[in-house]
């Protein structure tokens, strides 16, 4: 698995609620068209300083991720990002599964 984590900061003038609504209603539908995207999770941050949301996109390989970067779908999603995201920090991350489900938690 190849995963990229994004820390996103909303544009000045957007409330946290407006940021999340745009992300959910406009941006996520654009990213659903990415071929090779295996998983996409978004974590809005509740209150406080720092990023307004984290997102993790997972692919089978770095090549699969790179392949979408050159597509019109990706360019459209990036253009949309510029309308509501001031800054994005990105990181290639590993994955250490901890809990597979509620049944995995036992004393």
Where in this protein do the model-derived segments appear?
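Macromolecular interaction modules
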Residues: 1-107
